[in-house]
Amino acid sequence: MIQAKEELLAALGLALAELVPGSDLAPAFENPKQAAHGDLAITAAMQLARPLRKNPRELAQALVEALGRQPAAQKWVDAMELAGPGFINLRLKPAARQQVVSAVLSQREGFGVRAPNGQRVMVEFVSANPTGPLHVGHGRQAALGDAICNVFATQGWAVHREFYYNDAGVQIGTLASSTQCRLRGLKPGDAEWPASAYNGDYIADIAREFLAGATVKADDRAFTASGEVEDIDSIRQFAVAYLRHEQDLDLQAFGVRFDHYYLESGLYSSGRVEEAVAKLTAAGKTFEEGGALWLRSTDYGDDKDRVMKKSDGTYTYFVPDVAYHIHKWERGFDKVINIQGSDHHGTIARVRAGLQAAGVGVPQGWPDYVLHKMVTVMKGGEEVKISKRAGSYVTLRDLIDWTSRDAVRFFLISRKADTEFVFDVDLALKANDENPVYYVQYAHARVCSVLARYVEEHQGDLATLADADLSLLAEPTEFALMNKLAEYPEMLGAAAADLAPHNVAFYLRDLAAHYHSYYGAVRFLDGAVEPMRARMALLEATAQVLRNALAVLGVSAPRKM
């Protein structure tokens, strides 16, 4: 159907040019809302009716006639039908649907993958403060970010994955002082324990390792604890390195990798923060008031001007963010995407204002943002709010330990990022159709089981299925399954364009549903040899697309369950 659709799209363009010379309306197909309406729908007549001041149904009839004269339509279209005020529904010939099986079997992992386009995209995600274990919100961000990276890779982009460490803020001081309190024998609940201190057991772990003079590695650098309770600099450096290492272990367990870890402290040591402030001041976009330095961010759509440098000489947190994004711009990426929690929404306007004011050529609306909402964890019918390890929140490691990496990744990406998500631990453990990741993985395992029986019971050769007579695939459930397979490349393109990796999860559930319906309707291993081979070719193609799509989400495709 992919080749047929491409040829028909070109034919539709020629038909539109014949019907409306000079029109800039791009030829396009839509998927009918109901399968009974056909395989493809055209709405061009209704879009053209108002500017041309013509009846849309009459335009549709003329378009049907013009399209019908095109060789591609004669080759691939079985029938064209008018519907409603001016819809055109196309029913394709069986060969148009069947060709997707050959395409999948020939391209395998490359099905749906575009050739390199010479463009680079940078995706910044997770970017947790090195002050504690990764929480479930970081987990959602990791799942979203990794999937977006994978989706862009399928579209031919060179992908750069970046993690930004806020290792220079007030919270780092709180981490160091909390660890020092533990070193002095204090614990949460003691009268002398600071109200602002971090309470999780991980602080006690850091203190124990620090006293032992342990060495930890972060960014290929080794940090050895001095073991001195009053050595606050050593405590701070060791605690940050310890937690960065712990976060790295959590990300490894989650199957997420990064190409670069960018340190906020490096922005200060390299002079980039001062350079950014100098650019803004030289451009006349700052002013002094009350002993502080302000940015005229209202000139760029912010709701009020923002303090950049406080009266005590320290910078507010958005200033290094501006410096960081100037460096992102200078590195020459064609596209930059930030994935953050929705609580960061207020920072977008001021960062973009700073970038515009700096006068370095950054276009308006740069970079792109994906903001995700919070995750609520339910277990045993009750909300889980705390973790012994973290002290005040559920960690990513908790979720992985309670369920599985596959379940956590699939669940956290199975809804639009801008919707709140309830992670039901009990549901993630169910081995039935209620559990979406089980439902999809079981479809793959079920296909593999049938293919294994074909080899064992019928001495079938999977390597020769590409030669099967696909014209024998004529059952309604087979047509529906082939249509769904054919949607995969276009779905990936839309997921990249819309920054919507949840589309992949939705697609997987639909594809699994089509396969399960097919499984219930057809006896795969009965009957004559050639129809059986054709069915096995369709199953092999289905398994391949399930694997491809699951890989985009970073989820495994088990062959047995």
From Swiss-Prot:
Q: Which InterPro entries match?
A: aa-tRNA-synth_I_CS (IPR001412), Arg-tRNA-ligase (IPR001278), Arg-tRNA-synth_N (IPR005148), Arg-tRNA-synth_N_sf (IPR036695), ArgRS_core (IPR035684), DALR_anticod-bd (IPR008909), Rossmann-like_a/b/a_fold (IPR014729), tRNAsynth_Ia_anticodon-bd (IPR009080)
**Care to name a GO molecular-function term for this sequence?**
ATP binding
List the keywords (alphabetical).
Aminoacyl-tRNA synthetase, ATP-binding, Cytoplasm, Ligase, Nucleotide-binding, Protein biosynthesis
Which superkingdom? Bacteria
Q: Kindly state one GO CC term assigned in the UniProt record.
A: cytoplasm
What start-end ranges are recorded for coiled-coil regions in this protein?
none
Location(s), subcellular: Cytoplasm
Q: Keyword check for Cytoplasm, yes or no.
A: yes
Q: Name one Pfam family in it.
A: Arg_tRNA_synt_N
The Enzyme Commission number assigned here is 6.1.1.19
Asked if Chaperone is a keyword of the record, the answer is no
Q: Which reaction does it catalyse?
A: tRNA(Arg) + L-arginine + ATP = L-arginyl-tRNA(Arg) + AMP + diphosphate
CDD domains cross-referenced by the UniProt entry: ArgRS_core
Where can the motif 'HIGH' region be found? 128-138
| A single GO BP | arginyl-tRNA aminoacylation
Say where the protein is mainly found: cytoplasm
HAMAP family to which the protein is assigned, alphabetical: Arg_tRNA_synth
Q: How does the record describe its quaternary structure?
A: Monomer.
Give the UniProt family note: Belongs to the class-I aminoacyl-tRNA synthetase family.
Q: What is this protein called?
A: Arginine--tRNA ligase
Question: What is the scientific name of the source organism?
Answer: Leptothrix cholodnii (strain ATCC 51168 / LMG 8142 / SP-6)
What does UniProt list as this organism's lineage? Bacteria, Pseudomonadati, Pseudomonadota, Betaproteobacteria, Burkholderiales
Q: Which gene encodes it?
A: argS
